[in-house]
Swiss-Prot record:
One of its GO terms (biological process) is translation. It comes from Chloroflexus aurantiacus (strain ATCC 29366 / DSM 635 / J-10-fl). Belongs to the bacterial ribosomal protein bL33 family. It holds the Pfam family Ribosomal_L33. This is Large ribosomal subunit protein bL33. InterPro entries: Ribosomal_bL33 (IPR001705), Ribosomal_bL33_CS (IPR018264), Ribosomal_bL33_sf (IPR038584), Ribosomal_zn-bd (IPR011332). PROSITE patterns: RIBOSOMAL_L33 (PS00582).
Length: 54
C-alpha cells in the first residue's frame, strides 16, 4: 500500500497557566505559523490561552 502524505499534522496545544495539554490537527498549508487558541483549562477552571508546541 502506498502511504499518504497529507497537509494535516497532529499538534499539541499547551496551556500558558498550567501543564494541561490538548492534541488536535492542523493544516500545514492554511496555518503555517504556530496556533494560539483560547480554550478551557480544567486545572484552573477557566478559559486561558493555549499555544502550539512541538
Amino acid at each position: 500500500m502506498a502511504s499518504k502524505k497529507g497537509n494535516r499534522i497532529v499538534i499539541k496545544l499547551k496551556s500558558t497557566e498550567s501543564g494541561h495539554t490538548y492534541t488536535t490537527e492542523k493544516n500545514r498549508r492554511n496555518d503555517p505559523s504556530r496556533l494560539e487558541l483560547r480554550k478551557y483549562d480544567p486545572i484552573v477552571r477557566r478559559h486561558v490561552l493555549y499555544r502550539e508546541t512541538k
